[in-house]
């Protein structure tokens, strides 16, 4: 599903649902033209099957997978984030960097190592290297850049352990930052972006390799190491380093680079790459640097939570009912649904013992808090019209409570393990209270009072109690307040006064993104599509492997296997970076102003982001999360400190010993959160989830036993349940119970049934059009000063300043000046005393 090249995507009009997408491609990604064949394809038949089997070890057909000890955070561990910057193909360049540094260093210092010099000598040599970046000869400049990269990599040739390398990295990078290296690198990067000769040469080449992006890769490596290291706070950091960190963050988010924040330059590189004008750009490094730049300037998720609490207090709203990060961390994963083979066995048992099966079904329906998915019938492909034979003629569980025997008493020990209470405090919107009161008034009194939520005259006592409970759990979001304030500005532009827009980093970034935001979103989604494991190689798809393919293709099976792992790892890192960038931007824009968030979200929807994410999840997700596409002995800094052992096919197949791949689980959670943000309270987009048959895809993702991932899957299933029909709900009672357990409740939200007014099939196109009109009015009012209404512009009423202004009069007026003077001045009486008072 290609991201759209422009206008709105296929929304549902007048309840005419578009046809579902064609069957998804197989879950094995084919590399673009010029890429190496998958490693397994070069092996003999039995060996290839064994290799593929090991790659998918313990990921198919096992409902009882172990709990994943995964803690969601802004980033992975520092060492892991550093190692993912380099592809394994770049390995030989570490020694090249060292050689360039030592050749230059020995000219100036003959008797000492870098680690033996004092701070002043370090600073002197760093400034000498910086001066070397200003030479015009490209080869000399590249050698100096490599020497600086070696310093930023921790001068590993003089270190004996990984910890020592990381310690010297921090010291060296703050030293480089102090002497002004980053700004010099930005200028060089700008020059390389505009290097027309390199771009035209790359466009003409049939196959682009690592050598075409050497200059860019060296610059981006240094900049990434600086941003990533300065952003990370460590115990034992010097006091001046904290000051430098704050200054660097402020500069990085300010419009200091071509009057734009640095992130806009990187977004420009992404769009230039996707347009085909610069196919040699090393996109993985650009996206990683873009992610870390956005993270450094805007702040991570914990910082976002504190900013949200602060903003609520400024707007006079009550504090948040709970810290969502802490609640999610304390949640436990539920058992995943049974596999298809388990379902067949269950159906056979039901055929033999139908009566007992019904009793067991009822017992388990009573909100089993320990294993809400246990014995859930999760077939691989579920449709609305599926008929489960064991449920034919069966009444709904709640309707047969009188007939069925009471639930069996569980032992007391079992009860002790059950979580007490629900994890989230319920919420109610002002709109929900209004709707409840309106329906109650029309039912009991026969009148309505609009948006009045206080008058309860004539309503029965139970209704009073209900309203009291609803108001106790009333939650007003920052977005609602911002939307109301925007309506007020548009309704009364004069009395409202001038809006004071605080220039926080998110505001500065949005102003930079605004002119080309649709193009940026389309470009990111194009790269995400190319990197997704379910994508097939197409002749017109972009080649994202320019910075991983060597100049000479591998000639042995072992080299092919190594390159196959490298290519898969490369794609996984790209997915990780894009998912993190999109989620960070959505969350920060929503906090800064709701219409900034809606503008970005709407363009993601128009570019087919929803079906793209569903296509990503339409694979064996356990296989993706447990994939072992890494070679730990080749990871930095291990590879520069220790002697490399001889690689064998067995060691490559074994991969690492981790239970799961951190970056892949992180990417999956991010994509689910993005999907949740795009569809929340948007019925037209929720219908897209239904039309694209997302329910079975999402249910398969519940097999991953990780609480946070399960929570966001259940949220996405919850918004659809009212549209999926009675049969789906009957067949998935365990999933319904899990939603009740783990997802926040909205009082009066009839999510489990189709009775809600919002669930009825309206013209959903109108909903998107109204939202788009609000967004355009907001952008025009706040940012489009050139087209603002002249009647509402401020007027200078001071006589002296007005008379002192120089006015350029048109020629025809000057020629007829006497006539104007006679008509407008001399023939009209003027009370000069009143005028001058």
Curated annotation (Swiss-Prot):
Entries under InterPro entries matching the protein: Far11/STRP (IPR040185), Far11/STRP_C (IPR021819), Far11/STRP_N (IPR012486)
Lineage, uppermost ranks: Eukaryota, Metazoa, Chordata, Craniata, Vertebrata
Compositionally biased tracts (Low complexity): 36-46, 333-343
Protein name: Striatin-interacting protein 1
Pro residues composition bias: residue spans: 18-35
Organism expressing this protein natively: Pongo abelii
Region feature Disordered, mapped onto this chain: 1-67, 333-423
Job of this protein: Plays a role in the regulation of cell morphology and cytoskeletal organization. Required in the cortical actin filament dynamics and cell shape. Part of the striatin-interacting phosphatase and kinase (STRIPAK) complexes. STRIPAK complexes have critical roles in protein (de)phosphorylation and are regulators of multiple signaling pathways including Hippo, MAPK, nuclear receptor and cytoskeleton remodeling. Different types of STRIPAK complexes are involved in a variety of biological processes such as cell growth, differentiation, apoptosis, metabolism and immune regulation.
Superkingdom of this protein's organism: Eukaryota
Subcellular location: Cytoplasm
Region of interest: Required for STRIPAK core complex formation: 796-837
UniProt GO MF annotations: protein-macromolecule adaptor activity
Subunit annotation: Part of the core of STRIPAK complexes composed of PP2A catalytic and scaffolding subunits, the striatins (PP2A regulatory subunits), the striatin-associated proteins MOB4, STRIP1 and STRIP2, PDCD10 and members of the STE20 kinases, such as STK24 and STK26. The STRIPAK complex can be extended by adapter proteins such as SLMAP:SIKE1, CTTNBP2 or CTTNBP2NL. Interacts with CDC42BPB. Interacts with CTTNBP2NL.
Keywords: Acetylation, Cytoplasm, Phosphoprotein
Compositionally biased spans, kind Basic and acidic residues: 47-60, 356-377
CC annotations in GO: cytosol; FAR/SIN/STRIPAK complex
Modified residues (N-acetylmethionine): 1
Main location: cytoplasm
GO biological process: cortical actin cytoskeleton organization; negative regulation of hippo signaling; regulation of cell morphogenesis
Keyword rRNA-binding annotated: no
Biased composition (Acidic residues): 378-391
Modified residues (Phosphoserine): 59, 335, 339, 788
Family designation: Belongs to the STRIP family.
One Pfam family named in its UniProt record: DUF3402
PANTHER family: PROTEIN REQUIRED FOR HYPHAL ANASTOMOSIS HAM-2, STRIATIN-INTERACTING PROTEIN 1
């Amino acid at each position: 599903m290609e991201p759209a090249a422009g206008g709105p995507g296929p929304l549902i009009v007048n309840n005419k649902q578009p046809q579902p997408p064609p069957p998804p491609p197989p879950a094995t990604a084919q590399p673009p033209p010029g890429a190496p064949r998958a490693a397994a394809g070069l092996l003999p038949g039995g060996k290839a099957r064994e290799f593929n089997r090991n790659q998918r070890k313990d990921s198919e057909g096992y409902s009882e997978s172990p709990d994943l000890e995964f803690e969601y955070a802004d980033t992975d561990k520092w060492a892991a984030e550093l190692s993912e910057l380099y592809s394994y193909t770049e390995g030989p360049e570490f020694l090249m960097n060292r050689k360039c540094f030592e050749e230059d260093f020995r000219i100036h210092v003959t008797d000492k190592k870098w680690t033996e010099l004092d701070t002043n000598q370090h600073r002197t040599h760093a400034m000498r290297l910086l001066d070397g970046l200003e030479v015009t000869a490209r080869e000399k400049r590249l050698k100096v850049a490599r020497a600086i990269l070696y310093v930023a990599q921790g001068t590993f040739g003089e270190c004996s352990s990984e910890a020592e390398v990381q310690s010297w990295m921090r010291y060296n990078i703050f030293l480089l930052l102090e002497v002004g290296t980053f700004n010099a690198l930005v200028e060089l990067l700008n020059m390389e972006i505009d290097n027309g000769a390199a771009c035209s040469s790359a466009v003409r080449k049939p196959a682009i390799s690592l050598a075409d992006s050497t200059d860019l890769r060296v610059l981006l490596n240094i900049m990434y190491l600086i941003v990533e290291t300065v952003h990370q706070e460590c115990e034992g950091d010097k006091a001046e380093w904290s000051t430098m960190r704050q200054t660097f963050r402020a500069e990085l988010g300010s419009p200091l680079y071509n009057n734009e924040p640095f992130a806009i330059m990187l977004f420009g590189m992404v769009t230039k790459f996707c347009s085909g004008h610069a196919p040699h750009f090393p996109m993985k490094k650009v996206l990683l640097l873009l992610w870390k730049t956005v993270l450094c300037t805007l702040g991570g998720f914990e910082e976002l939570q504190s900013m949200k609490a602060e903003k609520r207090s400024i707007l006079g709203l009550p504090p948040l009912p709970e810290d969502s990060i802490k609640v999610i961390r304390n949640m436990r994963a539920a058992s995943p649904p049974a596999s298809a083979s388990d379902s067949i066995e269950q159906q056979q048992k039901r055929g033999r013992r139908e009566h007992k099966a019904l009793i067991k079904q009822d017992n388990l329906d009573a909100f089993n808090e320990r294993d809400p998915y246990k014995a859930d019938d999760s077939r691989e492909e579920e449709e609305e019209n599926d008929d489960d034979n064991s449920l034919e003629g069966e009444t709904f569980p709640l309707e047969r409570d009188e007939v069925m025997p009471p639930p069996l008493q569980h032992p007391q020990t079992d009860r002790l393990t059950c979580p007490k209470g629900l994890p989230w405090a319920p919420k109610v919107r002002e709109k929900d209270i209004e709707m409840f009161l309106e329906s109650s008034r029309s039912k009991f009194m026969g009148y309505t009072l609009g948006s009045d939520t206080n008058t309860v005259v004539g309503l029965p006592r139970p209704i009073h109690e209900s309203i009291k409970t609803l108001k106790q759990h009333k939650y007003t979001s920052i977005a609602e307040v911002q939307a109301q304030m925007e309506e007020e500005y548009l309704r009364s532009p004069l009395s409202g006064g001038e809006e004071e827009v605080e220039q926080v980093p998110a505001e500065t970034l949005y102003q930079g993104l605004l002119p080309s935001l649709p193009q940026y979103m389309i470009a990111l989604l194009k790269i995400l599509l190319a990197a997704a494991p379910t994508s097939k190689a197409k002749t017109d798809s972009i080649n994202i492997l320019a910075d991983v393919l060597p100049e000479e293709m591998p000639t042995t099976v072992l080299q092919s296997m190594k390159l196959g792992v490298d290519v898969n790892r490369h794609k996984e890192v790209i997915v990780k970076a894009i998912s993190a960038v999109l989620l960070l931007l959505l969350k920060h824009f929503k906090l800064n102003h709701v219409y900034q968030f809606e503008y970005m979200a709407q363009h993601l929807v128009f570019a087919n982001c929803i079906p793209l994410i569903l296509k990503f999840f339409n694979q064996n997700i356990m296989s993706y999360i447990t994939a072992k596409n890494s070679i730990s002995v080749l990871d930095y800094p291990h590879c520069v400190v220790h002697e490399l052992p001889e690689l064998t096919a067995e060691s490559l197949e074994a991969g690492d010993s981790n239970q799961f791949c951190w970056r892949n689980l992180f990417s999956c959670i991010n994509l689910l959160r993005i999907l949740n943000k795009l569809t929340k309270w948007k019925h037209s987009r929720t219908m897209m989830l239904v039309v694209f048959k997302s329910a079975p895809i999402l249910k398969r993702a519940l097999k991953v036993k990780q609480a946070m991932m399960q929570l966001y899957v259940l949220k996405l299933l919850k918004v659809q349940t009212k549209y999926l029909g009675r049969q789906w709900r009957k067949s998935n009672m365990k999933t319904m119970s899990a939603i009740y357990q783990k997802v926040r409740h909205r009082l009066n939200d009839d999510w489990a049934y189709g009775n809600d007014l919002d669930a009825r099939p309206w013209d959903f196109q109108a909903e998107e059009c109204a939202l788009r009109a609000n967004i355009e009015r907001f952008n025009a009012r706040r940012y489009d000063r050139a087209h603002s209404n002249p009647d509402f512009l401020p007027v200078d009423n001071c006589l002296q300043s007005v008379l002192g202004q120089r006015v350029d009069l048109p020629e025809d007026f000057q020629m007829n000046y006497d006539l104007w003077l006679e008509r407008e001045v001399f023939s009209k009486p003027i009370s000069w005393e009143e005028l001058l008072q």
